């Protein structure tokens, strides 16, 4: 048996926090949670992870990001979505035909995810099969768990970033065969978005998904120009979502990123099918796409998660992903005539952790029977306050101000994958740089 000691803060339900000062998580030898303890046992005959005085938080689940766009983080932010794709995204993704380049970028990406406390992902690769396998290798090596998709696109990709329909299907099957060697990273079918895939390709992916029982991820109603484009390509579809539905790709556990402009009818289709929304507020604001009606989605019973959506999103930080969702909801409040309530810190923390972890079969918060996914945060170097803060206040402060320097330990799938507990805390303001590779 093992014991993780510290100040525990987790989100067992939307809007609810459980805070346990000087608490402990009792784990079995495989890192499975046996019990959440409100008092630390005095005599414990087993391995102890002593994080006394540190926050023990759930790790983050990033439910939508583009791995090959990592080199582009922070660039092209003055362009709308479709122009940005042509000018920045497609050219950099084409470079991942070079496996040496792919290895360097993906190794850095995987390490940075763990360093920021993100342990579960649903991720887009590029259309390159071998580079996608490299990405899966690097994620698994770093300790990340989750789903990765080889992108499918047989039209509108531009120079050097487009497959034939036959090639896309053939390479998808080759990739799926190779995926059997991975333990913690699994495949997810990934038609880039409707404008990038012909009907023949979409139909083939729907058939593969049904035959092999595979999940699907894509994009939905991110940008008004994109929606109009889909309408031109599929005049038989009254709404964007139907362009997936008619090929068997609109189903339980399908992840749809964005849904910024999903109206009541489209939201109803999302809920009824069990489709999962990956809300990406940083990306949506950066590309001026809009702000998703998250409060309405939650009120209507939709399953909402969060995504960093790099490189339209500007940070891999799970904590920034959470706080950006709060900021976006506040902007929505004063621009929407209906004045929907903004997200609270407990609600946003839930969306960035528990709600995403549920996609992988986890329970609510630190639930007994789940493999541990946690991050220990050293907040001792934050500015001294005139009074002692409660654990919920410390969580709020950490979410808004923490950096990777404050992350002192990370557990993924019950494994300790990052351990800096013996190092002195690094000031958040310290300048840091690291060479790629």
Locate predicted features.
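N-terminal metal-binding scaffold of metallo-dependent hydrolase/deaminase domains
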Residues: 1-43, 54
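C-terminal cap of metal-dependent C-N hydrolases
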Residues: 13, 371-431, 436
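Active-site gating loops and adjacent loop-to-helix segments of metal-dependent hydrolytic enzymes
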Residues: 73-104, 150, 155-165, 223-251, ...
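Alpha-helical scaffold segments that flank or form the walls of functional sites
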Residues: 73-144, 168-181, 436-437
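His/Asp/Glu-enriched, well-ordered alpha-helical/loop segment
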Residues: 246-253, 295-383
């Amino acid at each position: 048996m093992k014991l993780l000691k510290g100040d525990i803060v987790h989100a067992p339900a939307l809007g609810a926090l459980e805070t346990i000062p000087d608490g402990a998580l009792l784990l079995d030898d495989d890192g499975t949670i046996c019990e959440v303890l409100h008092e630390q046992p005095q005599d414990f005959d087993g391995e102890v992870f002593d994080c006394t005085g540190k926050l023990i938080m759930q790790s983050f689940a990033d439910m939508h990001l583009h791995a090959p766009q990592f080199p582009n983080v922070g660039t092209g932010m003055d362009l709308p979505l479709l122009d940005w794709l042509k000018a920045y995204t497609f050219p950099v993704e084409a470079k991942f035909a070079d496996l040496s380049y792919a290895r360097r970028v993906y190794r850095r990406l995987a390490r940075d995810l763990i360093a920021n406390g993100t342990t579960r992902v649903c991720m887009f690769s590029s259309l390159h099969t071998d580079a996608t396998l490299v990405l899966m290798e690097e994620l698994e090596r770093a300790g990340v768990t989750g789903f990765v998709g080889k992108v499918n696109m047989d039209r509108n990709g531009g120079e050097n970033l487009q497959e034939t329909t036959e090639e896309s299907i053939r390479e998808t099957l080759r990739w799926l065969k190779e995926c059997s060697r991975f333990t913690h990273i699994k495949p997810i079918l990934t038609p880039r978005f409707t404008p990038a895939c012909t009907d023949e390709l979409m139909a083939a992916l729907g058939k593969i998904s049904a035959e092999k029982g595979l999940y699907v991820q894509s994009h939905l109603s991110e940008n008004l120009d994109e929606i109009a484009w889909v309408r031109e390509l599929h005049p038989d579809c009254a709404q964007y979502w139907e362009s997936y539905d008619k090929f068997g790709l609109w189903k339980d556990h399908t992840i749809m990123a964005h849904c910024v402009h999903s109206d009541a009818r489209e939201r109803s289709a999302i809920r009824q099918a069990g489709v999962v929304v990956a809300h990406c507020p940083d990306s949506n604001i950066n590309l001026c796409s809009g702000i998703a009606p998250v409060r309405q989605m939650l009120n209507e019973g939709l399953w909402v998660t969060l995504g960093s959506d790099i490189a339209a999103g500007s940070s891999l930080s799970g904590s920034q992903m959470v706080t950006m969702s709060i900021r976006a909801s506040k902007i929505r409040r004063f621009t929407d005539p209906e004045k929907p309530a903004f997200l609270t810190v407990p609600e946003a923390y839930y969306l960035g952790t528990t709600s995403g972890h549920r996609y992988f079969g986890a329970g609510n918060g630190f639930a007994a029977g789940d493999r541990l996914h946690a991050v220990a945060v050293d907040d001792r170097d934050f500015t001294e306050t005139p009074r002692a803060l409660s654990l919920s206040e410390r969580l709020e402060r950490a979410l808004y101000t923490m950096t990777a320097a404050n992350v002192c330990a990370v557990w993924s799938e019950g494994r300790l994958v990052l351990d800096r507990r013996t190092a002195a805390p690094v000031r958040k303001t310290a300048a840091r740089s690291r060479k790629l590779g």
